[in-house]
Structure formats: structure tokens, C-alpha cells
């Protein structure tokens, strides 16, 4: 009687299942993923970036930096629930700022809302425009939250421009709790992009744009900081 080999002996050894592309990229750093790098610009200055240069007419170190717009949620004095952030020019291309967390800034009970803390970082980074004498807006901002910030506490912020390449400004900031040397509560890296006045006149609400353009001081300042893309 002839023996027939079992069917399992004729089957090739099972190959490991191929890992789906999404799983293959899951452990890669975000900025190394092809689909991410196309959509989100890197926060790391490229090799040909250059050090930022403080403008000769920038505010002197220690000088208060005036609000760029009175209704700004970050620095505007007429914004009732704003941060009322106060900034001063530092040495080099650096600014320091501070704001006190009010009850209107709560997220969790008795704690600053995370979005408010991001706003404080963003506002301090935007204040670097005064030192560079340019108009730029946030293109990307990445924040690390390191500890809770209670209502009634003061956040001491420091922002600096790290590198420039064309219209791109690479910068970073941190916020310390209750003193300039206190524990770091939040930190950020950001990419700002230089723009012209058209950026605001094209996208802003007409009423506010009209009022801003009728303010001679604000209009003069905007024109002085304007750059060509």
C-alpha cells in the first residue's frame, strides 16, 4: 500500500505577516515620517540657517515692549479677559515676559487652561518681532506641559530667536512658575513666518482692519516692520 505524504508536508513554511505601513512608521519620530514632514514643517533649523540679528532700532535691553494691538488677547490692555502679558526686551534676540493667571483663565478647577498657557508662549514668541523689526506669524508651535499652573500664580516667560532662514524664524520659549528661576512649567519650540501687511488686510475682519488702518501709530508701525516675501 502506497503511503501519501501528508498535505501539511507539501505546504511551504508560513511567512511572518508583513507589518502594515502605519505600524512601521509608528515608532519613527514625527518629523521623520514622510506623511508628517510634508504637512508639518520641521522645528529644527536647517544647516544653512543663520543666527538672528537684533535690529539697530530694537528696544534697549530692559525696555518695556508696548502691546502690538490694544485688543490682542495676549497683550492688549483693553481685552477684559486677556492675559495682559507684559514683556521687556532682553539681550541679543531675547525677550522676557510675565502674566498672572486669573480666574477667567481656568481649565480644570483652580488651574490655568492649557490653551491659555500656549497663548502666553505664543505671545512672548511673537514679541520677538520687535527685536527683529519684522512682522511674522506662527506657522507651527509645539508645547511641552511639565507641571500644573494654579490660578493666582505668575508665569515668567523667556523667548528667544534661535535661527533664521529666508522668511522662516526658528525660536523657542519657556515659562517658569512664580519666579524667573522657578521650576519650568511649560516649554515650546516654534516656527514663525515673515509676512507683509497684506496677510492681515486680506484675512482679518473688515471692521477691525479699517479701525487699525485709521490708527496712524499702528499703521506706521506695521509699515515699518513689513518685509517682502
Residue positions per predicted region:
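HotDog/MaoC-like acyl-thioester-processing domains
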Residues: 1-11, 31-64, 150-151, 162-229
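Catalytic strand-loop segment that frames the active site of acyl-thioester-processing enzymes
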Residues: 3, 66-112, 227-229
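Hydrophobic beta-strand-centered segment that forms part of the acyl-chain substrate-binding groove
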Residues: 4, 41-43, 123-157, 162
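A generic structural signal for short beta-strands and their flanking turns/coil linkers
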Residues: 81-83, 93-97, 135-141, 153-155, ...
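Short beta-strand micro-motifs enriched in acidic
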Residues: 88-90, 160-164
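A structural signal for short, well-ordered beta-strand segments
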Residues: 97, 141-145, 159, 173, ...
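Short amphipathic alpha-helical face segments that pack within enzyme cores
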Residues: 116-120
